[in-house]
Design a protein with these regions (language model features):
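Extracytoplasmic small-molecule ligand-binding "clamshell" domains
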Residues: 22-92, 101, 240, 253
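Ligand-binding cleft/hinge of the Venus flytrap
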Residues: 40-42, 56-65, 128-133, 145-164, ...
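Alpha-to-beta junction loops
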Residues: 64-66, 83-91, 135, 172-185, ...
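Flexible hinge/capping segments at coil-to-helix
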Residues: 119-136
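Ligand-binding clefts/hinges and TM-proximal coupling segments of bilobed small-molecule sensing domains
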Residues: 66, 144-161, 198-201, 231-258
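A ligand-binding cleft/hinge motif common to bilobed small-molecule-binding domains
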Residues: 76-79, 93-101, 151, 177-211
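Periplasmic-binding protein-like
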Residues: 34, 111-118, 191-231, 253-258
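Short helix-initiation/N-cap motifs at beta->coil->alpha
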Residues: 53, 69-79, 124, 159-173, ...
Length: 258
């Protein structure tokens, strides 16, 4: 390749990066976990589905961009974004102070409380610290709900799992006394055949210092314009009714929050 062509390729590459950093990209690579029903999971046909995915597609349509979805294990989500593997995270990720030190976020697109589920027939009937003292509680590691469990239930034993599916299996088989996760995730599960073993006993008040500022779209530092585009799109689909149509497919309550 000649020097002129190399120079031109470099200029085009820099221009493309600059456009992406300015939030003007027309194609975005979006990461989700693909293992957190009903928010994001792989259907029987191998296609990504769920609330996060449908909201993400609606946001992309509103922004008039093409979104290319990819799955990533939870612990690798932020490192992958920072390394440039993805342009955005839409994966039920809470906007917390700790995460804001590494990445930026849009405004929240849902905000629902931590919820406790126990086996049917359990003698545990309350979500108080005393009621769960000495009990074994399962949670997905690295999530806001695992932080809530460790900060609030200090007299309980907290067992962390790589995915929500694994703690559900242990609860179903009597290896856990309770689990903690998002209301939407657990409500959908207990209302399915797979979750018929168990029941919700209560929710915890949303505390910003623990739960964060709701669930947002994550982007790299320096791409605040892209975050703003997502924020504007969130408000637009909320206003035009698209959000409600998607919400009502998955939840019995409005997940949007305050």
């Amino acid at each position: 390749m000649s020097f002129t062509r190399l120079a031109l390729a470099a200029i085009l590459s820099i221009s493309a990066v600059s456009a992406s950093q300015a939030g003007d990209a027309t194609k975005l690579r979006v990461a989700t976990e693909g293992a957190y029903p009903p928010f994001n999971y792989t259907g029987a046909d191998g296609v990504l589905v769920g609330f996060d995915v449908e909201i993400g597609n609606a946001l992309c349509a509103q922004m008039k961009v093409e979104c290319e979805w990819g799955t990533q294990e939870w612990d690798g989500m932020i490192p992958g974004l920072v390394a440039g593997k993805y342009d955005a995270i839409i994966a039920s990720m809470s906007i917390t102070e700790e995460r804001l030190e590494r990445i930026s976020f849009s405004r929240s697109y849902y905000n629902t409380p931590s919820t406790i589920v126990v086996p049917k027939g359990s003698e545990i009937t309350e979500v108080t610290v005393a009621a769960l003292s000495g009990r074994l509680i399962g949670a997905q590691g690295g999530t806001t709900h695992s932080v809530v469990a460790e900060e609030i239930y200090t007299d309980s034993n907290i067992s962390l799992y790589p995915t929500s599916e694994e703690y559900k299996l242990d609860l179903e088989n009597g290896r856990l006394d309770a689990v903690i996760d998002d209301l939407g995730a657990l409500e959908g599960w207990i209302n399915s055949e797979a979750g018929s073993c168990c029941k919700i006993i209560g929710t915890l008040p949303i505390q910003t210092e623990l739960h964060g500022q709701g669930i947002g779209v994550g982007v790299r530092k320096g791409q605040e314009e892209l975050a703003d585009r997502f924020s504007q799109a969130i408000l637009a689909i909320r206003e035009n009714g698209t959000y409600t149509k998607i919400n009502d497919k998955y939840f019995s309550q409005d997940a949007f929050g305050e």
